[in-house]
């Protein structure tokens, strides 16, 4: 019996902007469904910005019938405070699909780039062209 198509949401966590994209994976074929950005109000308190990410992504997962989530792994920044804040945002981003019952997997940016472009150190223009 052939595998059924799977609807996957990809998430690129950030406190200011969290990018998301939904695809359908059907064997070796991928089909774009939707994409967007969640931008919490920058003037809101930190905890409210995290809540905004969590709630918005929960709605997006439900609206698009997602079954699995792929989250980009975090890299360590030069600024420890920024890295810690990104870690908080990443936690909210990972919890939203988990609460919705999705399987959540983590992938390194280089692995994602290699899968899309064929090279692990591709730039954003190369990725956009391939998508």
For each predicted feature, which ranges?
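Phosphate- and other anionic-substrate recognition elements at nucleic-acid/protein interfaces
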Residues: 1-131
């Amino acid at each position: 019996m052939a595998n059924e198509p799977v609807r996957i949401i990809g998430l690129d966590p950030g406190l200011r902007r969290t990018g998301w994209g939904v695809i359908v994976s059907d064997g070796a074929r991928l089909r774009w469904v939707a994409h967007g950005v969640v931008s919490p109000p920058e003037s809101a308190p930190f905890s409210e910005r995290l809540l905004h990410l969590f709630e918005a992504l929960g709605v997006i997962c439900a609206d698009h019938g997602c079954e699995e989530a792929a989250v980009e792994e975090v890299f360590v920044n030069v600024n420890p405070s920024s890295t810690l804040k990104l870690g908080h945002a990443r936690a909210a981003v990972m919890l939203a699909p988990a609460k919705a019952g999705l399987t959540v997997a983590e992938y390194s940016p280089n692995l994602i780039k290699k899968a899309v472009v064929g090279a692990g150190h591709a730039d954003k223009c190369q990725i956009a062209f391939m998508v």
